[in-house]
Amino acid sequence: MSELLSDKDIKSERGELNDWSYDGVKISKEIRFKTYMDSIDMINLIAEEAERINHHPDLKVGYCNIVVDFTSHDLGGVTKGCIQMAKYIDTETK
C-alpha cells in the first residue's frame, strides 16, 4: 500500500504537473474537450490506467469537460499513486 505524501512532497510533485490544485486532501484538475465524446474517450483511458495500477479517481463528467479528483480513500490523502495517475493524465491531454 502507498504511503501518504507530505505537504512538502506534494508541493514539489505539483511542480511537475499541469494545472492540478491541492486542497490538503486531494489533487484535482478540470479538463476541457471539444466534444462530449472526446471527454468520454478520456474517461475510458483514465479508467484503463486506473485499473492497471489499481488507483481509481473520482470523476465528474460535464458536457465537454471532466473533473478528476485523486486521493487515497483508505489513507485520507495524496499518495504516489495519485501523482502517478496525474502525470499519466497530463501526458494523455497534451
Where in the sequence are the language-model features?
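N-terminal first-folded block
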Residues: 1-36
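RNase H-like, Mg2+-dependent phosphodiesterase core
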Residues: 62
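C-terminal structural segments of small proteins and small subunits
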Residues: 68-92
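Alpha-helical scaffold segments that form or flank carboxylate-/histidine-based iron centers
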Residues: 29-34, 66-73
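Solvent-exposed alpha-helix faces
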Residues: 44-45, 87
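Short arginine-rich
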Residues: 19-22, 47-57, 93-94
